[in-house]
Amino acid sequence: MENNFSEILKDFLAENNLSQVAFAKAIGVKQSQVSEWLKGKAKPDYDSLKNMALAFNVSADYFLGIKEY
């Protein structure tokens, strides 16, 4: 499995037909933050990662590249 966070996030957004804006709103961050993650310029903090897992009912391990979706 690919373990690069930006690639994992790109794939997740595409597979779930989510825009950066919709994803950001669902996890409580700004779209600009999601853009930075997608560009590989930043990585999510603990709270953002937790919110991703809770908002989309996906293990944080998936976003970390440890487990498959």
Task: Show the residue positions of the predicted features.
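The alpha-helix within a helix-turn-helix
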Residues: 13, 24, 53
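Residue-level detection of the helix-turn-helix DNA-binding "recognition helix"
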Residues: 14, 28, 39-41, 50, ...
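DNA major-groove recognition helix of helix-turn-helix/homeodomain DNA-binding modules
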Residues: 47-62
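Short, charged recognition helix plus adjacent turn
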Residues: 11, 36, 54, 64-69
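A short, Lys/Arg-rich alpha-helix, primarily the initiator
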Residues: 1-18
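Short alpha-helical DNA-recognition segment
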Residues: 18-36
